[in-house]
Amino acid sequence: MLASGAESQDRYRNTPSSRIFTPGFRPTPATTPEPGIYMFNMEPSQP
């Protein structure tokens, strides 16, 4: 059960749910095919 920080980060990065809960993360239409997640994640990032 030894997972390095890079491994765990990469695993979460591939998880769609991580994109929603990751603060400061700005997805692009190319990485996120779902426009719903894109808009939902961009709203809280707006000042």
UniProtKB/Swiss-Prot annotation:
Segments for region (Disordered): 1-47
Family: Belongs to the FAM66 family.
Name of the molecule in the record: Putative protein FAM66E
